[in-house]
Amino acid sequence: MTVDTSTSRKQFLIRSENMSADDFGELYTRMFGNLYSGMPRPERPVAIGGVYGRHEGGSFRRLSFRGDLLTEMPDLDDEITFIFPSAGRVVFNQSSDRVGMPGVGLAMEKAQVRSVGFIDGHAHHGLSVRRALFARRLAMLLGRPITHKVRFQPRVDLGSEAFQGIKAIVAMATGNEFEMLIRSSALMPERLQEMLVDSVLDSWPHNYSEALRRPAPQIAPRHVRLAMEYIQQHP
């Protein structure tokens, strides 16, 4: 296990090689606060491997689970999580279960999830983002306030190339080379977050997708505006 050990910046990255779920949770609490403290302990030993990072307003991860893990979900300030499974199954318990598996991606609103299970040697790439970050970015891109909550399509076919860009950014962020970039740039965590937000808004279907794809309004040349004003004044 290693963490980002830079002394000049807040630590936000965990690298684990088959750390026990208890040890992973303890390290998480030390680095990010007691978000998951008080959760029931696993009934059987579970090992967690991979990389987990959390920066203001979101997280990214590439994790694998050796053993089945069922855990409750804490209140995560209206975060939306996106899962790209590569092995096993992940089961989110809401009013009904939603199951992610290789080829099937999920977008889940964590506030509506009661518990989540990682089953059958589950592994995935994933990220979580606060809804407010999506709303802020959409307002900037569309040039107007966002009046409705952004809602993402809950289940997608990962066979579509559109989703590979998101996964590639997560893979880059959880790769060994990225740690060098983190240590060399204090702005990198924020830039990474911007890349993830933009790639999700661009690729994962949501209720503002159509608005984003509309061509931006163009300013007509002055002579065109004058002609239009004349026509309006002299019908």
Where are these regions (language model features)?
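Glycine- and acidic-residue-biased ligand/ion/polar-headgroup-sensing regions
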Residues: 56-58, 65-95, 131
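Alpha-helical bundle regulatory/interaction domains
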Residues: 2-39, 43, 91-235
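Conserved hydrophobic/aromatic beta-strand scaffold that supports enzyme active sites
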Residues: 52, 60-62, 82, 105-107, ...
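Conserved short histidine dyad/triad with adjacent acidic residue
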Residues: 11-16, 41-54, 58-75
